[in-house]
Amino acid sequence: MSTFIAVINFTDQGVRAVKESPARLAAAGKLAEALGVKVKEAFWTLGQYDMIVIAEGPDDAIAAWMYKVGSLGNIRSTTLRAFNAAEMQKIVGKMP
């Protein structure tokens, strides 16, 4: 399974309904499970981004999940593929 980090900003619609944000995350988590994605951590943040979500799953399942969640109109996200130390060691081990 791959690890992804999503940095999220609320849209105007999302911030107007910010009180619903915890419930939206719970619903997104249920959708994630149905797609074979595990939400490992989620944080609401102050500063440049409104939330950070760390999830694991197959690449196509993460993509489907993030597209669906984004299509609801409450967030915009940038999703990053993340590598732990063991994965990075394998990657650099393949370098000539």
Task: Set out the residue ranges of the language-model regions.
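A compositional/biophysical signature of low hydrophobicity enriched in polar/charged and small residues
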Residues: 1-96
